[in-house]
Amino acid sequence: MKIILLGYGKMGHEVEQIALQRGHEIIARIDKDKDIETQRLRDSETHEIVAIEFSTPATALENINLCFDMNIPVVCGTTGWYEHLDEVKARCEKENQALFYAPNFSIGMNITFMLNQQLAKLSEKYGYRLSLTETHHIHKLDKPSGTAVKLAEDIIESNENYNSWKL
């Protein structure tokens, strides 16, 4: 598979390392400080290409649209851009584009999401009060994280005692 890395920070480097170990080809690395490879990307054939997007909340939407302009499917792990999600979904439907996105791709965290939903249901039945606390490194770009937002939204969806969350 040919891969475009959109965002070449910590996650971009990790994705690259694993992709190369598995025999995939990195055809472009696009980062906020280095947009040099964009023209090469536009000139390449786009079949058998997927873009893996781990950039920033400020650039994710632009990156997704750039890929859609070239009919390149996107896997997006960036959060903090979801206020534009409805328009991206509409574009996917209208133009038959492909987007797979999640606030966290970790298997362990996705198990935690499921357990959180069950806990929210049980706590409603027995009257327990739920709260979330999140701690991150100082370089975290989206605060609260998409993971924390997903946990909070799942509690609201699973427990009628909650209808919103706040910082």
Indicate residue ranges for each PLM-predicted region.
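C-terminal substrate-binding/catalytic lobe of Rossmann-fold NAD(P)-dependent oxidoreductases
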Residues: 2-6, 10-42, 58, 126-167
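Structural motif
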Residues: 6, 54-55, 77-78, 102, ...
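Rossmann-fold NAD(P)-binding glycine/threonine-rich loop
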Residues: 65, 69, 78-101, 107-121
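Rossmann-fold NAD(P) dinucleotide-binding segment
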Residues: 41-78, 86-91
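Short beta-strand and adjoining strand-loop segment in the mid-core
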Residues: 106, 120, 137-141
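Hydrophobic beta-strand scaffold residues
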Residues: 26, 74-75, 98-99
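Short, ordered loop/turn segments at secondary-structure junctions
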Residues: 32, 79-81, 104-105, 135-137
